[in-house]
């Protein structure tokens, strides 16, 4: 049985840890409210923008030039991995890394073995995971979530779009956490570029196509709207991931606080038993000493 001093030290240590996890839970809860609000607000905006884009693009003549929807032979792939800069968020980052590994194994193993797969890591933890594999990310964005805005996210989205336009990459996949609720985050793997044609085809053959009046022309509007829509979509990925991170950290810290509470109960019980055993031992020694004197 451990000594009373050892148990007291462990109780003090666990109590200190509990205070830290409780404080982190409260901080994450405060940040989550703002991050969740921003993620919820951009969803209808992004969906409406994409709906307008699809209706306009579907009404264009077949064969109209759309560089962002151009399907090319897949010679080089870019995977954008969206993680966090900090840990203590449960399996938030580990699940993203697992999803990236699964994506490569299931769809792009030949490209990967031929060293034709590059990574962009948004968040420190993604870059660390790739480094552990003996590789390095082609580009890292750290600290982006400290002051996340459309302007701060624009640099990353424009780099990805330009890399696709110049032919450096033939396809871009994005892996991120979509926010569902505080306790649930859904791993999403989406093809960012080229723009998938299924949605446009569905709109083209649907009866809900909207009859827009264009000024100056459809082609010019689409030319301007597609890049903006892509930037909004990329920004949405980051907002979803940011809200998911705070939700995951809040849940993890809540669980850690509860675990610390249970551990404190067990340690206090151990302390009381050790103290009782020590007192019993002292009483027995006193009684034994008194009997020895009487004899």
Swiss-Prot record:
It is found in: Cell inner membrane. It comes from Cytophaga hutchinsonii (strain ATCC 33406 / DSM 1761 / CIP 103989 / NBRC 15051 / NCIMB 9469 / D465). This is ATP synthase gamma chain. The lineage of its organism: Bacteria, Pseudomonadati, Bacteroidota, Cytophagia, Cytophagales. The keyword Transport applies. Its main location: membrane. F-type ATPases have 2 components, CF(1) - the catalytic core - and CF(0) - the membrane proton channel. CF(1) has five subunits: alpha(3), beta(3), gamma(1), delta(1), epsilon(1). CF(0) has three main subunits: a, b and c. It holds the Pfam family ATP-synt. The gene is atpG. Belongs to the ATPase gamma chain family. NCBIfam families: ATPsyn_F1gamma.
């Amino acid at each position: 049985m451990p000594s009373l001093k050892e148990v007291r030290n462990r109780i003090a240590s666990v109590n200190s840890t509990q205070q830290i996890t409780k404080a982190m839970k409260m901080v994450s809860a405060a940040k989550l409210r703002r991050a969740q609000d921003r993620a919820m607000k951009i969803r209808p905006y992004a969906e409406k923008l994409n709906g307008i884009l699809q209706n306009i693009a579907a009404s264009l003549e077949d064969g109209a030039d759309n560089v962002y929807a151009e399907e090319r032979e897949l010679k080089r792939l870019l995977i954008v991995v969206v993680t966090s800069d900090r840990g203590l968020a449960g399996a938030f980052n580990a699940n993203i890394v697992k999803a990236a590994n699964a994506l490569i194994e299931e769809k792009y193993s030949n490209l990967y073995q031929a060293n034709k797969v590059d990574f962009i890591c948004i968040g420190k933890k993604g870059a660390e995971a790739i480094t552990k594999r003996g590789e390095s990310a082609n580009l890292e964005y750290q600290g982006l979530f400290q002051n996340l805005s459309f302007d701060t996210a624009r640099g990353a989205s424009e780099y990805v779009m330009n890399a696709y336009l110049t032919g450096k990459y033939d396809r871009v996949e994005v892996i991120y956490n979509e926010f569902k609720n505080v306790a649930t985050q859904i791993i999403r793997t989406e093809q960012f570029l080229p723009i998938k044609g299924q949605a446009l085809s569905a709109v083209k053959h649907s009866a809900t196509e909207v009859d827009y009046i264009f000024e100056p022309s459809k082609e010019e509007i689409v030319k301007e709207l597609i890049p903006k829509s892509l930037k909004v979509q990329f920004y949405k990925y980051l907002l979803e991931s940011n809200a998911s991170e705070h939700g995951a950290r809040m849940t993890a810290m809540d669980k850690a606080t509860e675990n610390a509470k249970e551990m404190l109960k067990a340690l206090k019980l151990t302390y009381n038993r050790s103290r009782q055993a020590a007192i019993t031992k002292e009483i027995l020694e006193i009684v034994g000493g008194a009997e020895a004197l009487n004899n």
